[in-house]
């Protein structure tokens, strides 16, 4: 019965996923606007349970919204990486998330966070050091603004490593993947974009 249940979950998940590479499959959001998608807090529990039972690693790109299912997903996640841009609104939202998740996840280590699109020309920004002071924690990565690299990847439907395997951002993403999957000790990136993380995995 157990074997049949696992095979059933595998078949179910295989029908939902789109294979992108040997080690990457995507579960995409609906592409049509014919109906409204208002999800309840437990709407994705079945899918998440099936993914956890059949996949070695599940990464969820949770949308920038706060409702029942996003709250439930974050609280039950093994690890959380908050992605923020260096402005006041993102600092406020990240601070609120940090404060809530530290309380809601007492037995788990605190969320990680990274800064994205840093260094946009002529845009006032909050410095990474000021971000770190407000959140009482260092970012695990700081990604510089690079419209050509990220624009090419987005328009071609490619990952950063596929566009430029030797780019410093590709190395940063590799180190982030190692951190979040716990597969190896994270080292400081050559470009200096990834902060030292020795001992951070066990930090509460």
Whereabouts are the PLM-identified features?
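Phosphate-binding/switch loop-helix module in NTP-utilizing enzymes
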Residues: 27-70
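Conserved Switch II/interswitch segment of TRAFAC-class P-loop GTPases
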Residues: 77-96
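Conserved C-terminal guanine-recognition region of P-loop GTPase G domains, centered on the G4
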Residues: 91-110
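Beta-strand-loop-alpha "switch" segments that mediate conformational coupling across diverse proteins
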Residues: 118, 132-160, 173
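NTP-binding/hydrolysis catalytic cores, primarily Walker-type P-loop NTPases
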Residues: 157-204
């Amino acid at each position: 019965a157990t074997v049949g249940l696992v095979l059933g979950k595998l078949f179910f998940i295989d029908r939902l996923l789109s294979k992108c590479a040997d080690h990457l499959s995507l579960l995409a959001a609906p592409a049509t606007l014919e109906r409204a998608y208002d999800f309840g807090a437990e709407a994705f529990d079945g899918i998440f349970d099936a993914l956890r039972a059949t996949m070695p690693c599940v990464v969820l790109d949770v949308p920038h919204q706060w409702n029942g299912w996003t709250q439930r997903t974050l609280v039950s996640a093994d690890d959380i990486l908050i992605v923020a841009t260096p402005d006041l609104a993102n600092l406020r939202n990240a601070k609120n998330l940090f404060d809530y998740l530290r309380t809601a996840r007492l037995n788990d280590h605190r969320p990680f966070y990274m800064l994205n699109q840093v260094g946009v020309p002529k845009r006032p920004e909050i410095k990474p050091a000021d971000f770190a002071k407000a959140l009482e924690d260092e970012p695990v990565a700081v990604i510089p603004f690079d419209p050509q690299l990220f624009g090419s990847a987005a328009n071609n439907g490619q990952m950063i490593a596929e566009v430029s395997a030797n780019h410093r951002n590709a190395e940063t993403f590799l180190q982030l993947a190692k951190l979040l999957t716990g597969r190896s000790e994270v080292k400081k990136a050559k470009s200096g974009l990834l902060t030292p993380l020795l001992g951070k995995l066990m930090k509460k």
